[in-house]
UniProtKB/Swiss-Prot annotation:
Pathway: Porphyrin-containing compound metabolism; chlorophyll biosynthesis (light-independent)
Provenance organism: Picea mariana (Black spruce)
Keyword set includes GTP-binding: no
Keyword Cell inner membrane carried by entry: no
Name the UniProt record assigns to this protein: Light-independent protochlorophyllide reductase subunit B
Function: Component of the dark-operative protochlorophyllide reductase (DPOR) that uses Mg-ATP and reduced ferredoxin to reduce ring D of protochlorophyllide (Pchlide) to form chlorophyllide a (Chlide). This reaction is light-independent. The NB-protein (ChlN-ChlB) is the catalytic component of the complex.
Matching Pfam families: Oxidored_nitro (PF00148)
Family according to the record: Belongs to the ChlB/BchB/BchZ family.
Length: 104
C-alpha cells in the first residue's frame, strides 16, 4: 500500500483482504494489477489479463533491485494507458527510485 500511495496510485481493491464475492465485480475496473507475491494472486491476474486484457506486474517489490524493476514496470503500464490522453506528459518515478535505493 505504501509504495502505491507514494507513487500516487489509487488502489481499486486488495484481494483477498476484506474482499467479498460482491466486490469481485469491481475487479475489471482496475487499469492493471500488482501481484506482490506470486504465490497469491498470479493465476487471478493471468485470468484477468486473458479475459479483460488487464496487464499485471508480478515482480515482488522487495529489495532495491526488484523494487526499482517493479516501479519501472508500473510506469510502463501507466505511460501506455495515459498515452492517448497525455501525449506529452509521462510519469517519472526515477527520483523516487533513487531516493529509495541510494543508500542501500
Amino acid at each position: 500500500r505504501r509504495l502505491l500511495k507514494d507513487l500516487d496510485i489509487r488502489i481499486n481493491q486488495i484481494i483477498p483482504e476484506g474482499g467479498s464475492v460482491e466486490d469481485s465485480k469491481n475487479l475489471p475496473k482496475a487499469r492493471f494489477n500488482l501481484i506482490p507475491y506470486r504465490e497469491v494472486g498470479l493465476m487471478t491476474a493471468m485470468y484477468l489479463n486473458k479475459e479483460f486484457g488487464m496487464p499485471y506486474v508480478s515482480t515482488t517489490p522487495m529489495g532495491a533491485v526488484d523494487m526499482a524493476e517493479c516501479i519501472r514496470q508500473i510506469k510502463k503500464y501507466i505511460d501506455t494507458l495515459a498515452a492517448p490522453i497525455l501525449s506529452s506528459k509521462r510519469v517519472d518515478y526515477e527520483s523516487y527510485i533513487d531516493g529509495q535505493t541510494r543508500f542501500v
